[in-house]
Amino acid sequence: MSKHSLQLVECPRDAMQGLPYLIPTQKKIDYFNALLQVGFHTLDFGSFVSKKAVPQLADTAEVLTGLHRGESNTKLLVIVAAVKGALEAVSYQPVDVLGYPFSVSPTFQLKNTRQTLADSLDTVSQIKEACHDAQKDLVVYLSMSFGNPYGDEYNRKIVLDQIESQLRLGIKIIALADTVGHATPKQVYELTSSVIQTFPEAQFGLHLHGEKSNWQEKVKAGYEAGCNRFDGALGGFGGCPFTGSERVGNLDTFDLFSWFDQQHLETGINKSHILNCAKMATQLFA
């Protein structure tokens, strides 16, 4: 197995957003400050979206005031779903990266952002401009990259066409998202290798969902296809609450770290810190 530098993205925002109870703001701050010391490339910790739609993350601005990076190089990422939220997000100096969910499935895009794909593409363009002006990065999460449960037309050409549309807007980082956890290792390998070969100018990540029984082969397939950016959430909690189908949890970031460590691949992760945070996650999400 060849070596290439790995970027692990920790997504407590994804783990929290669908919980039936609210986590106190101070507990979030304490947890995120601990995560900032682990060595993750990026921390996806909050969002500037409708507070009614995602009440769990309504305190993102307050959380930001309590975060202390110290010497951490971890980038702070927030999710936005509209231009209004993006303009608020870029006004906060500590925020490094905005993430926008753009779906291959038109049905899911309507469910998730209440926009058509055409309108969403216009939204991406405006958000990209706001990020450029504020010197922030923008990651597009390509939801339903491996198929959808709605019967919407799906094939690899549709995915490639959507990616090409994003790149024309100047997007440089795209995460292929298996939103409902249905992707097979074969699909992960074939699509990931295809997009990397077709669009060498972009960076592609994988935001996979899956069960404890099937995550490893998916990750191996993605890595062998050339992917070097992987999302996860400690404990494997979470899953998108807006799909209309049963939620499948995130990949457990500790499992990801352990697997890469066994392959003698460098992740930049501090083992004692990630162990401590894994214990915190168990208590926080219990």
Kindly give the residue locations of the regions a language model identified.
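Catalytic cores and adjacent flexible loops of soluble metabolic enzymes
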Residues: 1-286
